[in-house]
């Protein structure tokens, strides 16, 4: 009896969260729902994919890469086909990432996209706040060991404070994926920046691009 009561309480909480206007709360609830009811989760996914919210659509696509459901594969295949036309660029990396999850080749996929010149997959759709945390605190990437941002960090590599004024998104992405392709004036080979695909997931790369593409004036400690 207690178990049924707890399940009913959880279902009620999920229902409220799924219908909340906060996209992040909705996505979190959808992922919880998928753990117990994949069919209902698929119904929500299909609805979310028709929404204007990029966050909700990204969350739905991410879930497609984890569900053990033939319908999830079908929808994901359709989304992949739409990448050649109407699918917003901000969702392209999410589709690739969801597909890659099924074959466990996510980073190899991003490298392949880069090699093919498909920079657009990680150009837009990132989260600037997550990107800020990655740039400042990711242990393996260690951006601030060499770069300075808003007066914090090293000086052996270009200052990233106003990177958005010097580089467009494609150049920012290239500097992460292929850092030795363009050497900043005055630094030569001293930077010796490692290729970040060794340390970052595709989504993290996209978040960093989004962060660096923003004006730094609103970046507060």
Residue ranges and their predicted role:
Residues 80-83, 90-99, 154-163, 179-206:
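Axial heme c-ligation environment in periplasmic c-type cytochrome domains
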Residues 131, 139-150, 160, 193, ...:
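The canonical Cys-X-X-Cys-His
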Residues 5-17, 27, 38-50, 58, ...:
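Amphipathic alpha-helical scaffolding segments comprising HEAT/armadillo-like alpha-solenoid repeats
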Residues 136, 145-152, 165, 177, ...:
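Detector for the c-type heme attachment site
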Residues 22-24, 54-55, 85-89:
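Alpha-helix N-cap/helix-start positions at coil->helix boundaries
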Residues 3-7, 33-37, 64-68, 84, ...:
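Alpha-solenoid repeat junctions
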Residues 111-138, 216-221:
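Electrostatic cytochrome c docking/interface patches
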Residues 29, 60, 92-95:
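Conserved hydrophobic register position within alpha-solenoid helical repeats
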